[in-house]
Amino acid sequence: MQRPVCLLIWLFLLEAQAFEIPINGNSEFAEYSDLVELAPDKLPFVQENGRHQRSLPEESGEETDTVDPVTLYSYKVQSTITSRVATTTIQSKLVNNSPLPQSVVFDVQIPKGAFISNFTMTVNGMTFTSSIKEKTVGRALYSQARAKGKTAGWVRSRTLDMENFNTEVNIPPGAKVQFELHYQEVKWRKLGSYEHKIHLQPGKLAKHLEVNVWIIEPQGMRFLHVPDTFEGHFQGVPVISKGQQKAHVSFKPTVAQQRKCPNCTETAVNGELVVMYDVNREEKAGELEVFNGYFVHFFAPENLDPIPKNILFVIDVSGSMWGIKMKQTVEAMKTILDDLRTDDQFSVVDFNHNVRTWRNDLVSATKTQIADAKRYIEKIQPSGGTNINEALLRAIFILNEASNMGLLNPDSVSLIILVSDGDPTVGELKLSKIQKNVKQSIQDNISLFSLGIGFDVDYDFLKRLSNENRGIAQRIYGNQDTSSQLKKFYNQVSTPLLRNVQFNYPQASVTDVTQNNFHNYFGGSEIVVAGKFDPSKLTEVQSIITATSANTELVLETLSQMDDLEEFLSKDKHADPDFTKKLWAYLTINQLLAERSLAPTAAIKRKITKTILQMSLDHHIVTPLTAMVIENDAGDERMLADSPPQDHSCCSGALYYGTKVASGPIPSWANPSPTPMSAMLAVGAKPLESTPPTHLNQVENDPHFIIYLPKSKRNICFNIDSEPGKILSLVSDPESGIVVNGQLIGAKRAENGKLSTYFGKLGFYFQKEGMKIEISTETITLSSGSSTSRLSWSDTAHLGNSRVLISVKKEKSVTLTLNKELFFSVLLHRVWRKHPVNVDFLGIYAPPIDKFSPRVHGLLGQFMQEPAIHIFNERPGKEPGKPEASMEVKGHKLTVTRGLQKDYRTDIVFGTDVPCWFVHNSGKGFIDGHYKDYFVPQLYSFLKRP
């Protein structure tokens, strides 16, 4: 199963031919004389003639090193991250202070998946610049240079976690050389944070060593952390400054600080500088950033309950897994099994030339079952060959059978995680046939993730296998760290929060959208979608996201203005104004490369190839189809920078490989029927303006009720004068299983000896649907069984199921629809945050319809069955413009006053005046009993009637 090690090493060897650069004047570098005695390392600036001698008397026979032949004058790295798009420049300057020519290698490591965009080199005054060519054209230019006897170099990078960019030049005595490499990448969110790594390996002490990382995130930064990756040697050297939306990390060790020890001539700068951060997320619909004709959509919702998962672990136990690989895999699996949730189902399939199962069916992740599975795994003894085909088909069969028999939770997700270290040696050996078998057998609701351990496995095959079946592949290095790598990957997929996530951009002027349909969304990660739009036709971009959470269908809407970012970006010189364009190109090219590897016909593959090539040339980046030609102005010195072998997966580091689907409008189920505006029962209070008013009017702040009586076509009003914390029953219908209650909150302080109260929280309980909905001034929470979904008022969203629909209008209202015929509207009233008295509060509107049972009651519910009223003897009141009258209702004769109340459904700030007859003394005589009879103990309690 394993290939010869020598072959593996040979594949990673870097070819190089050194430039012979003629001398062209003396070095112009200043202040490097004090570096002459600094000892060199061998990487990344290796001198082939790095040792020279001084003459001694023949009898002594001694040879000694004198000075460092090549001095590293400066080593600078600059990274700017604008909305996850990172652009990095690595620059180094060296001086040959030797009397002999010196060969210098520029060898730096860049992140896997990054696109090289530019490389320049200045050698003794001669400048080499780069251009992007189609790969065959670039190689032809390189071959021509060699054929004509001109100097040519070959630069190749190797496919490891960090790829190497390598070139070599031969510089004459006294000459200077400067290298500068530019690359760009996208930061992918993993386990709740973004991680930016800069590999620092100057190889020797540098007169000037400086690293700067600027981060600009319009969403604002939630945290920023620079972990110690140099074993405490540079403690306190990184300087961090963080604002709300911007941050700067600098790393500038002095020459003394760079030394491994006080008298050492070796540098301690050899490793990775890591910056970790995350951004704020206020909206579940994500952050839609629009700029310069492109948009990017970042989607990472939180506060959602995990979706139960059905998971099959398929583990290679062939002979090649013997030793550290198997030991580390067992340790990882024991931890992973412990992390399963009680509502998960699982089983284990292990295979060599035979296929075995711990359980033939999925079982619940109870403590007993987990303990038994761990004992089974601990007893595994690797041996034999590798039958990947049958192992995968067995796992698929178990999941398919459970689904067909109705044994799976319909709201769950199904995952297969394959762990293998080699190609098949038993059973079906043809990789394309295995790929076809899996594709034909697997159901659309199953995602396949592949983990390839070491380099013996055909990683390209695993990528195609997973990408085609709604998953991804990842390489795991077979060493002492294998266990933590396996656990880290599992943690990334262990918490599915959404299924069937689709991004829709319904406007006709939105084009070239990247993959917008994803099978799952996992907690701690982020989905990114990008596209183009025509600025001359659109002033804003609309998005509609549909998805399924643990207990409900979900629709999220957002709208972004074109000029939202322009002013923000213009104020920061480090912000990249092309970040939207770069991110769109990065996603598009990577997704096209993955599609190209799966293309079913040669014609489709040629079409995709043409698109990738043109985009690579347009955006000046090195991809598997292009090469970078590096030459001087005269064209008589030339190198070729080639890309690594083609990576058939999408977006290195990304957790998702999706598909493209046509965008559509809001689903029909998420469009509630219009609520009659005239026939509503209302509870609310008059708000203050959202901004500081120039003058304040005296208003009634206690909850006021407006009861519309359709038969008599009259509005009757009353107030409830109670205390904060009390919960009032608004609607209680035990027969229909419907509860609506409201909890009172108080003002910040009393005025004129009276503390005003408001509704700060509303509870809706639909008993037959098993659904509870809590609406506060901060969040909207939907609970169904053990699952909970939360939205904030900053979202525009729809969520629900076949019977209950919740529609949230950003910072305005929530509409609840039951069985498409019963409606409740909740309005949010925001007040000026610094107001000394008032607070945010809620108003509720309910239609007086006959959809409730005769037993319905509550302060609103009792009027669903209209009482007979008779208003007569209208007369002047005690206050001008407020006449009084007598009202007979429910056997009582009351004195009522004509006045105006506010309906805020059409005007949330000022409201619409509604004329009504006001009943005094907290509605006494108009409501049944006393208002204190309507107190209930809990937010979802039914009203107990005497």
From Swiss-Prot:
A Pfam family of this chain: ITI_HC_C
GO BP term, pick one: hyaluronan metabolic process
GO cellular component, as recorded: collagen-containing extracellular matrix; extracellular region
Coarse class of the protein's main subcellular location: secreted
InterPro entries: ITI_HC_C, ITIH, VIT, VWF_A, vWFA_dom_sf
Glycosylation positions in this chain: 118, 263, 445
Modifications the protein undergoes after translation, according to the UniProt entry: Heavy chains are linked to bikunin via chondroitin 4-sulfate esterified to the alpha-carboxyl of the C-terminal aspartate after propeptide cleavage. Phosphorylated by FAM20C in the extracellular medium.
GO molecular function ontology, one term from the record: serine-type endopeptidase inhibitor activity
Proregion positions: 19-54, 703-946
Chain ranges of the VIT domain: 56-185
SMART domains to which the protein is assigned, alphabetical: VIT (SM00609), VWA (SM00327)
Ranges for domain VWFA: 308-468
SUPFAM superfamilies noted in UniProt: vWA-like (SSF53300)
Cell compartment(s), UniProt: Secreted
Aspartate 1-(chondroitin 4-sulfate)-ester modifications at: 702
Function: May act as a carrier of hyaluronan in serum or as a binding protein between hyaluronan and other matrix protein, including those on cell surfaces in tissues to regulate the localization, synthesis and degradation of hyaluronan which are essential to cells undergoing biological processes.
UniProt similarity note: Belongs to the ITIH family.
Descriptive protein name: Inter-alpha-trypsin inhibitor heavy chain H2
Organism, as annotated: Mus musculus (Mouse)
Gene name tied to this protein: Itih2
